From Swiss-Prot:
Origin species: Equine herpesvirus 1 (strain Ab4p)
Superkingdom of this protein's organism: Viruses
Entry similarity comment: Belongs to the herpesviridae portal protein family.
Chief place of localization: virion
Protein name: Portal protein
UniProt entry tagged with the keyword Disulfide bond: yes
Composition-biased stretches (Basic residues): 707-726
Region ranges (Putative leucine zipper motif): 454-475
Job description of the protein: Forms a portal in the viral capsid through which viral DNA is translocated during DNA packaging. Assembles as a dodecamer at a single fivefold axe of the T=16 icosahedric capsid. Binds to the molecular motor that translocates the viral DNA, termed terminase.
Length: 753
């Protein structure tokens, strides 16, 4: 079937004939889009800051919205709700429902009645034949057969028509990846800014109506009508012609709506806002073409900037804060764990400051645990120190005795010597006889010999030490002041160097550089480092931290809170419906009736301007399978009403025929002898049959008719007659008489054959 065979509707022809020759002036009624920057080409003005226009997109903030939406700053579980909102399933189901409804509603009653009569003729069945065959003595049986015959035709017709209409629906695809009126882009604009920039495309001369852009299709591309193979069905059903005509008209109309609009890309459009006139204008940054802007949620002007009424505007701050916390935690992990920093705190002995002298004396004296009694020099120095602390000359005897006890051990013990002999320091004293041990004699000789020599030397030595300690106390204070100044200068130098390093770091460098990469990494200087502070440590300084402890700020609670914010914001803003199981676990997130009205209605009526859309789908229909959707739509159309009426009339015709047969047989004579002979031959009890409306009682009074016109005879039929007539044996089926009721009135056939 070609496009020329698709004739316009009669009402459109009548409207065209009535208005032919009459000039109709169309008034430009203001649309909602006109308040958002839609202007005719002759009224376009120059967009500039002097005219009060402010660029509201692209800005760093609006581009950040898109980055957040794409997961550039992290992704949480709650953000997955946006995938359910962005799904085009609801829009596709709405388009399919529209095409199905418009197509099936185009059915004509005359065509449907012809198809039904054709079916009866092909089966060789009529209402009179059904009544004669199955309704002679059981009306219910005949009615049941008639209903089953119509149900069979109803089911086969429904399957054929739905397959036929589904092929028409397949001509239009709303999920094209290169579609200009993409539903996904429409949702992205709403989530980011709450407004949708778009362009109205003009049809090129000679272009073919196609669901894609207005363009001339190649010769090898099949036409729109070739999507439907109507040869078989159109030759068998009268109703197929009207369905095909109306179905293709619905597809062409939707194709024209989608091909005449283009939702502009997020990264290729400049949006300007005029606060005084409350207008928004969109301009393509590559072509310079101007478009209009559908404002779904009005933005707010604040101090020279615009606050958008959108989910991303409300949640952007929390996303940035959580992202900064995660970056901080990553830097802490890199700086405090890997690489390892080693802090060295040992100083040389000669560079340890004023306290070194006392420590050296302690070392020489052997007071330390590691140097206790380890060398003869330390014991000698200890002897000198002890001699300095003497209060009188007599204490030298005890000092020398203790020194000799530590050093000589048993070297001089055992032998005796006469100390009265010359050489033991007793020449000037009165000689005393007697021998003394060698050790005691040596001790006495040493004491007498070194007493005079060391006393003056030791006094002068410790006097010098006291003078040095007094002088070094002032130098120690000056040294500490200089060290504090040097520490302060080093801190300033470190801050300046860090600022210079941060400024030289590339913005795109990753903070998660590999450990040990050193200055080559994006963080700069994260290699292994040895910090030498030996020259900075004081006498009582020590290593406070070796940087081996792992410290990472916890951000799990913040991430969970951000996930809940995403979930609540998207569900409540777009009115989505959460489906859970009996345990309260989430199964899916789907469109509700409110979200369908919020999102689908502006898309089809304001963006696509589809005027013959019909009712919006419900949330149950949005997620049905294609077959279930077709069956549900089939029951809502006028075709179903026509089929119900045909079924009712056909059953009524069968009942009418049964009543006519019963009234005819009521007047026929009955031969009781012949019936009795048949029963005797079979040897079985006879089965009694009554006219409709007669009582079964054997009483003669019960056999009398209600009109009082005498008695009616009971008819007896043999089993052979029951077999010949094809009556059912089941008593529940064959016995449906109305006890004590009047005969069923005749139904006249008001429907022409």
């Amino acid at each position: 079937m070609s496009a020329d065979s698709i004739e316009p509707k009669q009402k459109r022809l009548r409207y065209a004939d009535a208005n032919k020759g009459r000039k109709v002036e169309r008034k430009n009624t203001p649309r909602f889009e006109a308040t958002t920057g839609l202007q005719s080409p002759g009224e376009e003005e120059q967009i500039s800051a002097d005219g009060g226009w402010v660029l509201i997109h692209p800005t760093p903030k609006t581009m950040l919205f898109k980055e957040i939406l794409m997961g550039e700053l992290g992704y949480t579980e709650g953000q997955g709700v946006y995938n359910a909102i962005r799904s085009t399933e609801a829009a596709i189901r709405q388009i399919q429902t529209t095409i199905l409804t418009n197509t099936l509603n185009a059915t004509r009653y005359e065509d449907l009645a012809k198809d039904w009569q054709t079916h009866l003729d092909s089966r060789g069945v009529s209402a009179e034949e059904i009544a004669a065959t199955y309704g002679m003595y059981s009306e219910g049986e005949a009615v049941r057969v008639a209903e089953q015959i119509f149900a069979t035709w109803h089911r086969t017709l429904q399957m054929s028509l739905l397959d036929f209409v589904r092929s028409i629906t397949a001509c239009f695809s709303a999920s094209e990846p290169d579609g200009t009126a993409s539903f996904a882009k429409y949702i992205d604009w709403i989530a980011c800014l709450g407004l949708i920039p778009l362009q109205r495309l003009k049809r090129a001369p000679g272009a073919t109506v196609h669901p894609k852009l207005w363009r001339k299709l190649p010769t090898d591309v099949p036409s729109l009508e070739s999507c439907v193979d109507e040869r078989d069905l159109a030759g068998k059903l009268y109703v197929a012609n009207s369905l095909l005509r109306e179905g293709l008209e619905a597809v062409v109309e939707l194709a024209r709506c989608t091909a005449s609009v283009a939702i502009m890309d997020y990264d290729r459009v400049n949006i300007f806002y005029h606060y005084t006139r409350r207008e928004v204008v969109a301009i393509d940054s590559t072509t310079g073409k101007r478009g209009e802007c559908l404002v779904l949620w009005q933005p707010i002007w604040k101090d020279g900037s615009v606050l958008f009424d959108s989910p991303l505007q409300r949640i952007c701050g929390e996303v940035c804060n959580c992202h900064a916390l995660r970056e901080h935690a990553k830097l802490c992990q890199l700086l405090n764990t890997v690489p390892v920093k080693i802090l060295v705190g040992r100083k040389k002995d000669e560079a340890q400051g004023p306290g070194w002298a006392s420590k050296a004396v302690d070392k020489l004296m052997g007071e330390g645990e590691e140097l206790h009694s380890s060398s003869a020099a330390s014991r000698l120095v200890k002897l000198i120190v002890n001699m300095k602390s003497m209060r009188h000359i007599g204490d030298i005897t005890e000092t020398v005795r203790s020194y000799l006890n530590e050093t000589s051990t048993n070297l001089l013990s055992g032998a005796q010597v006469d100390t009265s002999l010359p050489g033991f320091g007793q020449s000037g004293k009165t000689k005393q006889g007697g021998n003394m041990p060698v050790q005691e004699a040596f001790r006495t000789s040493v004491i007498n010999g070194i007493n005079g020599m060391l006393e003056g030397y030791v006094n002068n030595l410790f006097k010098t030490i006291e003078d040095l300690r007094t002088g070094n106390s002032g130098l120690l204070d000056q040294l500490r002041d200089r060290e504090s100044e040097i520490t302060h200068l080093r801190e300033q130098l470190l801050r300046v160097s860090q600022a210079a390093a941060d400024g030289s770091t590339q913005p795109g460098a990753s903070s998660a550089a590999l450990p040990g990469s050193g200055a080559k990494s994006g963080a700069g200087g994260l290699g292994h480092e040895v910090i030498d502070i030996r020259n900075l440590m004081g006498d009582d300084g020590y290593v406070a931290n070796s940087f081996q402890s792992r410290y990472i700020p916890a951000y799990t609670a913040d991430m969970e809170r951000l996930s809940r914010l995403w979930d609540q914001e998207l569900l409540r803003c777009f009115k989505m419906n959460r489906i859970t199981n009996n345990q309260g676990q989430e199964m899916s997130v789907s469109y509700s009736n409110s979200s369908i009205s919020l999102l689908l209605a502006p898309y089809f009526f304001s963006i696509l301007r589809a005027r013959h859309l019909g009712f919006l789908i419900t949330h149950q229909e949005a997620y049905r399978s294609e077959e279930e959707l077709c069956v549900a739509v089939f029951k809502k159309t006028r075709l179903e009403a026509y089929l119900t009426e045909l079924s009712t009339l056909f059953v009524a015709r069968v009942r009418n025929s049964i009543a006519a047969l019963n009234s005819t047989k009521r007047d026929l004579p009955v031969n009781d002898n012949e019936a009795q002979s048949d029963e005797e031959q079979l040897g079985k009890p006879s089965d009694e049959r009554y006219y409709e409306g007669r009582d079964r009682s054997a009483s003669p009074q019960r056999d009398r008719g209600r009109n009082g016109r005498g008695y009616h005879k009971r008819r007896r039929f043999s089993n052979n007659y029951r077999r010949r007539s094809g009556l059912a044996r089941d008593s529940s089926i064959r016995d449906r008489s109305q006890r004590g009721s009047r005969p069923t009135p005749l139904l006249h056939d008001h429907v022409g054959h």
